[in-house]
């Protein structure tokens, strides 16, 4: 299922280039789904790839489209089980009912050749029959790490890139930015505590006069 917290409202659109945000606005109309086109989101970890595609997915669901979210690793394991249990055709039939299949983090976890073969079979099965929305930390030039051999890699890229929209999020990690902000706040807080301690020491070095005025205590040395 799509994580509900990854919505369009909670996505920080100011972080991404205007050109990429215009692509998102066009995707929200859903025309790419009717044309069975794909959406590919590339970028470093923590740049909002998953959040963005989940947000688009939620908007498409509101428009009546059938959308399903999978992490790549869990999807591959489900495909592999179906293959071993001789029910691949049934699983593909089930997935074919979806208008959009979101596959998150292709290439994040290294898979065996057999696992990647079932993933390739899925890509081939959905080609021009239903939309895929894919996130990956790896650019196409490194997809041979996923599909293991040049021919399969080229065929996989050909199927997903044909009729596709590519969103590039070459940004600084959002999580890293948040961690740095928190660290900065903590340093500022520590600095304020030091100032406060100094103030309290000055106050403790004096006493109040009977009329309420603060007087400094002088000690003869």
Question: What kind of region is each of these model predictions?
Answer:
Residues 39-43:
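Hydrophobic anchor at the beta1->P-loop junction of P-loop NTPases
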Residues 28-36:
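Phosphate-binding P-loop
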Residues 52, 56:
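Hydrophobic positions on the alpha1 helix immediately C-terminal to the Walker A/P-loop
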Residues 49:
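Conserved lysine of the Walker
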Residues 46:
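Walker A (P-loop) phosphate-binding loop of P-loop NTPases
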Residues 8-28:
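N-terminal pre-Walker A segment at the start of P-loop NTPase domains
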């Amino acid at each position: 299922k799509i994580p509900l917290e990854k919505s369009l409202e909670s996505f920080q659109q100011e972080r991404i280039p205007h050109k990429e945000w215009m692509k998102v606005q066009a995707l929200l109309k859903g025309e790419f789904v009717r044309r069975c086109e794909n959406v590919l989101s590339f970028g470093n970890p923590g740049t909002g790839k998953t959040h963005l595609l989940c947000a688009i997915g939620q908007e498409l669901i509101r428009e009546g489209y059938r959308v399903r979210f999978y992490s790549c690793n869990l999807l591959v394991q489900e495909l592999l089980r179906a293959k071993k249990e001789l029910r691949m055709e049934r699983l593909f039939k089930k997935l074919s009912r979806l208008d959009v299949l979101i596959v998150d983090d292709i290439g994040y976890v290294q898979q065996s050749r057999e696992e990647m073969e079932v993933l390739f079979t899925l890509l081939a099965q959905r080609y021009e029959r239903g939309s895929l929305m894919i996130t990956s930390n790896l650019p196409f030039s490194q997809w041979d790490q996923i599909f293991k051999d040049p021919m399969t890699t080229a065929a996989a890229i050909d199927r997903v890139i044909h009729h596709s929209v590519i969103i590039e999020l070459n940004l600084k990690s959002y999580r890293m930015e948040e961690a740095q902000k928190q660290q900065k706040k903590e340093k500022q807080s520590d600095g304020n505590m030091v100032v406060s301690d100094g103030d309290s020491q000055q106050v403790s070095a004096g006493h109040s006069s009977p009329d309420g005025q603060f007087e400094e205590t002088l000690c003869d040395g």
